[in-house]
Amino acid sequence: MSLETLLQAALFLEWQAQQQQQRTREENDKILVEQEEEEEEEEEEENKSVLRTEEHINQLPPDPVAPPAPAPPPPPPPPPPPSAPVTVIPLPVVSCTPQPVVQTTVSPPVLQRHAPVVSPPVLNKEVSLPPVIQRPPSTVLPEIKTTPLNMGSPKPLHHYQAPVLAITHHHLMQQQQQQPIQPQPTSLQPQQQPHPQPLGALRLPVTDDGRSNEQRRRPGGAGTREVHNKLEKNRRAHLKECFETLKRNIPNVDDKKTSNLSVLRSALRYIQSLKRKEKEYEHEMERLAREKIATQQRLADLKNDLSQWMDIIEIDRIVRQTVQPEDDQASTSTASEGEDNIDEDMDDDRPVNALSKRQQPGLIKMIPSSAAVHNHHSTILPQHVSIQQKQVPSPHTQPQISSQALVPTQAMVPAQTHIVTASAVQSTVIAHTATTHASVIQTLNHVISGPQTKHIAHIAPSTSSPVQLTTAAQPIGHITVHPATINHMTHLGQQLPIYPQPVAVSQPMMSHIAHTISHPQVNGTTNLGQPAVMTKPTVGTQMVHHPQLVGQTVLNPVTMVTMPSFPVSTLKLA
């Protein structure tokens, strides 16, 4: 369970509890309102019942008084003596009775009424005649009846005391009505003693009405209580289910008896721990995002560096392809380094050189230099040239070697092969490849120019047109080829590239064209895809070993042939 779900569950529980409380409050309010309404209705009913009882009581007195009502018919005979002072005596009695009724409250008029009612008959008995005594009570009684009825009608009878007083008042009125009938005034005291008895008799029905109202309330109250209990039971069951679900969602909570308070506390602790973990995870995500951005920037920088390095490597590769001679010259910056390499080659090939020394007396001179002068304009170097050279241990096989080295057909030489010429005057020849720039050649011309005669053979960049190879006018006496160099050339044939393009060479005073010049102490290295044959159609190859010639042939890019007399330390190609 996630934090949000727990919070939502807690909020849902609180919301349900609030709704349940509101419902219970509303129900309680309704119950109270109903109870109040019932009480008001009961009070109204009680008031109505009291009024009814009062009306009933008011209606009851005329029945016992009704028999004396026919008494007035006998008074008509006395009217003949009007001159008697009968009329003067009842006036004060009538005038005295209404004044205390207006000034006093409900309770005192009872006592005051007793006094005037009691006093006038005494006066009447003392002063007036017996017939006169009977008339004033008849006149006084209706007045007394009217006053209490007028007094009792406007009162709002909310309490139980008021009707009791009214009832007592009515009883007093009845007693007063009975008093004038009796001729003795002393009968008031025995009549006042039974007064409390009718009060108790009247109170009993009022209490019976209250008990009946209470009995009527109980069924309604019991029904509302049952409904309330049912709702409370449902609410508690729902809360119990909610606490059970909360307990299941919280880890590390004992399944034993646990109170709801402990469950809520553990839930709060769990929520707080989840909040802390959430904050930690947020910080971790921010840190990882920063690291990701940093690694992306570093990766972009590395890609930029790699692209730059790739560009540099590509440029170097293109430069090497286009300007390989300059790189090779830079690698062989001085001729002295070349001489060191030559010395190493000499150490490796000493037995071959020893074998070649044995074959020096048996070398065959082929064609004189006059033949080379005659055919110097028609020399063509085809693409494919083969040289078959074998090492013979004994001098008896020298004719076979010379015959194998001679081929009457056209000489096939690769187009980019470096052609090296040497003169008898110990001249130096540097042959450059087709990719060499003119600036390098000019530098070589300036550097190599000296007192001695030196020859530079340059082959122009490879094109479809033939390129002329020119040398100095001084004739070259002979070109020597050592048989050990042929084997060395075949070993290096698979390592250096071959440029099979035809090149035409014109040499006015050139007697022989050779691919390698070897010395007993030096091995010249050259690269040929196929063995080269040292012959031309009209020019033979003179294989004479020259003891003082030191030569090195490099196919690509520079071939340097140095003589001991040339200051090689001054030559440096950049």
UniProtKB/Swiss-Prot annotation:
Q: Which GO terms describe its molecular function?
A: DNA-binding transcription factor activity, RNA polymerase II-specific; protein dimerization activity; RNA polymerase II cis-regulatory region sequence-specific DNA binding
Quick check: keyword Nucleotide-binding in the entry? no
Which body tissues produce this protein? Expression in the CNS is localized anteriorly and in addition is present in the migrating neural crest cells.
Q: List the record's Gene Ontology CC terms alphabetically.
A: nucleus
Record domain bHLH: where = 223-274
One Pfam entry for this protein is: HLH
Query: Which GO biological-process labels does this protein carry?
Result: regulation of transcription by RNA polymerase II
Q: Please note every region of biased composition (Basic and acidic residues).
A: 23-33, 47-57, 206-217
| SUPFAM superfamilies tied to this protein | Formin homology 2 domain (FH2 domain), HLH, helix-loop-helix DNA-binding domain
Disordered: annotated segments: 17-84, 171-233, 323-353
Write out the annotated subcellular location: Nucleus
Annotated region described as Leucine-zipper, given as residue ranges: 274-302
Q: Acidic residues bias located where?
A: 34-46, 337-348
Please explain the role this protein plays, according to its UniProt record.
Answer: Binds DNA as a heterodimer with MAX and represses transcription. Binds to the canonical E box sequence 5'-CACGTG-3' and, with higher affinity, to 5'-CACGCG-3'.
Quaternary structure (record): Efficient DNA binding requires dimerization with another bHLH protein. Binds DNA as a homodimer or a heterodimer with MAX.
The name this protein goes by in its record: Max-binding protein MNT
